[in-house]
């Protein structure tokens, strides 16, 4: 689109010369009819498709307006077997093969869905189809086994090209009613499941029991005689029968019946799912006689060489029999238990010994023949001396909070424990103690004063001794870790140092440091206040005796 051109040059002196307000105004004029005819008026594009040509029908063609009909077609849709068969025998064999394959598939599918279902409807339907195939039709008409729908050219014009619904002529209505879509002789390969109402329905004879587990009725004997007679007649006429898949005749290739040399033995169908009970109360009788039958299972079962009158023997080659008889019920024996997982403590009790005493209810940990508690802070009484005893950290607190007899008993036990724990350490002397005598022994807890935190820190607990040298008479305090014998405290007594009580059970002991440049303060805590007083007296006495010597 080009810009409108100017009539003259625009300058600063003539800037208002193009203003339309000062000049004449052009009035629009209406165009004439000739001018309008020459002009082309643009119209918006239409979404409708042009009707020219034939368009392919869509899936919703029936809902829309009917388009132009296609030319008449003479196509025929034939459903069924062809009108003329080249070889009738080959067609029959193909039908039989297809029927057998469909039957096997139907049986497998039914067993997968319900292993305990009734397959008799499938067998009946199979026999019906097989017999219909065997019967040769009298005359085969070209259109007897086919359903032909011809397209009428006149009717095609009024119908949609994509519609599959064809109107039937008025003249053929009667013929359609008379003629079935599928002739009765044609095979049908559909194995539909039976209705729910008749799935597990038994005949009236099935609900009227014919025998019990322990007795044999007369009706059962008659039924067996009929079966034997029918089987004997079936073996004689096996060559003339045409049924190839029966369960009652011995000449069928798929029959599971007895052999010819065993005609005297009564035969029963292999796949027999019906029960032969004597009365409705047979279930009660089975519960009463179940225990006696289990104990006499060997007597009730007939052997291979013996023939029992009451027992019904299956075929010789039969290994999968689902039927049962009153004298030979189905029984699942429980396997013999080879491995028994039992608690040995529940079966055999350990012999009680006078030396071994059971642990008390308050015992904690592992106890092997003793009543000691290795994880308690206050060790109990024991008659056996040991080299190490558990730590009694909370012994002081438990003593103060105990009542009456309990506190006295703990004092006796702690006293015995203290004597027992110090026996081995006091009697055995360590390195450097060969020429020394121990004048005082006790069990104590050692603390050291920390200058940074300005408090006493625990360094260990163990036996404490005051040893005096035999030659020089000098005394020292020696303490080791309980159990391991690690050295905790080894200080010489000095006359210039002052030893005093810091509490009822605590004794303050100053000592020179290892480098000799400073003084370290130790705190010895014992169990009894009297022990603390004795310790303080020994310290003051031995430091004086050292200076006098």
Curated annotation (Swiss-Prot):
Compositional bias of kind Polar residues: 141-165
Pfam families for the chain: NUP50, Ran_BP1
The RanBD1 domain, residue ranges: 416-549
Compositionally biased residues, Basic residues: 40-50
SUPFAM superfamilies xref list: PH domain-like
GO terms of biological process kind: mRNA transport; nucleocytoplasmic transport; protein transport
Low complexity bias spans: 229-244
One GO CC annotation: mitotic nuclear bridge midzone membrane domain
UniProt-annotated stretches for the region Disordered: 1-57, 133-193, 207-438
Top-level taxon: Eukaryota
InterPro entries listed in its UniProt record: NPC_Nucleoporin, NUP2/50/61, PH-like_dom_sf, Ran_bind_dom
CDD domains assigned: RanBD_NUP50
UniProt feature, compositional bias: Basic and acidic residues: 1-32, 170-180, 217-228, 282-310, 328-339, 407-421
Keywords: mRNA transport, Nuclear pore complex, Nucleus, Phosphoprotein, Protein transport, Translocation, Transport
Protein name: Nucleoporin nup61
Organism: Schizosaccharomyces pombe (strain 972 / ATCC 24843) (Fission yeast)
